[in-house]
């Protein structure tokens, strides 16, 4: 319901959703629980931006039309964990010491203002003295015309050729990698540079005092700040899900507590997005699986006369005809729903929930575990038989393959019979005729065919429930040009 409202809100032309910054401050907040530790300027700046975003969201949600967005308009009161006063007071306290670039203000305290003013004056004095020495040295030919003061080890120095280093008295702090330049601090500015170093130490101590002071104000509110961060994360996640749903033109479908599938024009999300970029059209999937109890409920809606107690769909048809895509579409969309995402399908669709999703897709053979393709499938089937029940959705691709067809088909049929007896739901793809016959004769199991255009010898990628499909092996062999004699 929250997702449905968020999707509607984001497409409302009268509204503009606030944008802000959410930073993970859990580590910093955990650290400052200890007395004597503090948040640095960058962390305070991040906290300020996060609190400002929380305030924006509070105002935005509070102003929403409560009849149109009942859940989101109430989230500001029911979910936001701190008051406006707290947020405003905290932002004001941070703004007094941190500027809009995230740096500590000169006037964060009178003492800091004095120190920085003296540092600036001392640096100006050193710079003027160095420039005077530099001009004299250039006039005497000791230094190049393009030479300029530079910084080494936090002190202003002059770049001097080694041959002239004794002509400029002072302290050598460094030399270039080539050895063609030494960096000298002239004796005339040593005392001033020393004073600058002392002032920088005073500045660090005053900055630390200021940070400790504001951290002491933040410390009691740590639980509230963490709750605010969690709330912002929830809102951001909800917005991300809504944007993803809107990009797919997805819906939040009608749902029911009991397991069932009643899908109209459903799309695999990856195919949908990729084909859209390529200007292609995806063939949608319509499918219904339910047991008789669910389907006899007042809200049951059969599709095209499909029997209401068909829980397991056995899909057959040609290779590259769309069997696996149907299977993966069911797997993907069901998992998306149960993760709280919108799903791309027609609004007339209805979805149920499953406690277990058991999937056997692909080849899991392993040299390390001494498993062949067939052994890996059998191991999965053992797991399925053990855990499948009436709240389970099975998704099995190429059921029974990987061994001698006669034996593999027989084992697959026995496993399918057991899974059906346990009341499981499922979508299964196969080429085995015995499984098609089993589906035709067994209550709870139904055939599905991937349609094929015999005239043009090409798959239609459409699922038809209630009939078994053909592999069209002869037609495909003829199409690719195998000799007629074969």
Residue ranges and their predicted role:
Residues 114-164:
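Extended, Lys/Arg-enriched charged tracts that mediate electrostatic binding to polyanionic substrates
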Residues 248-249, 256-486:
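ATPase nucleotide-binding head domains, primarily ABC-like/P-loop NTPase cores
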Residues 147-148, 152-183, 193, 255-284:
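SMC-family hinge/dimerization module
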Residues 1-111, 115, 221-224, 228-242, ...:
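Conserved amphipathic alpha-helical "coupling/scaffold" segments
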Residues 6, 102-115, 175-181, 196, ...:
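Short hinge/gating elements
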Residues 134-152, 242-265:
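Long, charged, glycine-rich C-terminal linkers/tails
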Residues 178-201, 464-486:
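Short, exposed interaction patches on small structured surface elements
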């Amino acid at each position: 319901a929250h997702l449905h409202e968020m999707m509607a809100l984001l497409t409302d032309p009268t509204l503009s959703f606030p944008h802000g910054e959410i930073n993970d401050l859990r580590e910093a907040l955990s650290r400052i629980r200890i007395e004597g530790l503090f948040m640095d300027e960058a962390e305070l700046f991040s906290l300020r931006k996060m609190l400002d975003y929380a305030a924006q969201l509070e105002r935005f949600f509070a102003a929403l039309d409560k009849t149109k967005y009942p859940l989101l308009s109430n989230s500001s009161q029911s979910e936001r964990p701190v008051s406006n006063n707290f947020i405003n007071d905290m932002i004001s306290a941070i703004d007094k010491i941190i500027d809009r670039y995230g740096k500590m203000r000169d006037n964060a305290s009178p003492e800091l203002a004095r120190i920085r003013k003296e540092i600036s004056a001392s640096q100006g004095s050193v710079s003027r003295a160095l420039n005077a020495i530099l001009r004299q040295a250039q006039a005497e030919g000791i230094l190049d015309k393009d030479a300029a003061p530079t910084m080494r080890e936090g002190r202003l120095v002059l770049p001097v050729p080694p041959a002239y280093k004794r002509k400029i008295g002072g302290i050598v702090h460094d030399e270039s990698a080539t050895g063609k330049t030494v960096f000298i601090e002239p004796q005339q500015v040593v005392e001033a540079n020393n004073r600058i170093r002392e002032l920088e130490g005073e500045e660090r101590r005053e900055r630390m005092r200021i940070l400790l002071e504001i951290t002491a104000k933040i410390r009691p509110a740590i639980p509230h700040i963490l709750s605010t961060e969690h709330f912002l994360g929830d809102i951001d996640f909800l917005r991300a899900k809504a944007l993803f749903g809107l990009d797919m033109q997805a819906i939040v479908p009608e749902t029911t507590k009991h397991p069932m599938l009643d899908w109209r024009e459903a799309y695999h999300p990856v195919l949908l997005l990729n084909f859209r970029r390529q200007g292609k059209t995806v063939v949608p999937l319509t499918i219904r699986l339910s047991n008789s109890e669910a389907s006899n409920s007042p809200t049951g809606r059969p599709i095209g006369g499909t029997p209401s107690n068909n829980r397991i769909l056995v899909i057959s048809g040609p290779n590259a005809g769309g069997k696996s895509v149907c299977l993966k579409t069911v797997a993907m969309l069901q998992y998306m729903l149960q993760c709280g995402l919108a799903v791309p399908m027609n609004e007339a669709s209805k979805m149920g929930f499953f406690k277990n999703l058991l999937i056997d897709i692909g080849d899991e053979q392993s040299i390390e575990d001494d498993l062949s393709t067939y052994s890996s499938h059998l191991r999965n089937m053992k797991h399925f038989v053990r855990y499948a029940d009436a709240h389970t959705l099975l998704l099995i691709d190429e059921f029974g393959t990987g061994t001698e067809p006669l034996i593999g088909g027989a084992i697959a049929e026995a496993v399918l019979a057991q899974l059906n007896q346990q009341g499981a739901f499922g979508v299964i793809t196969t080429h085995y005729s015995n499984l098609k016959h089993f589906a035709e004769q067994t209550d709870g199991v139904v055939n599905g065919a991937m349609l094929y255009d015999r005239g043009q010898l090409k798959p239609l990628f459409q699922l038809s429930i209630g009939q078994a499909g053909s592999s069209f092996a002869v037609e495909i062999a003829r199409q690719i040009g195998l000799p007629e004699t074969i």
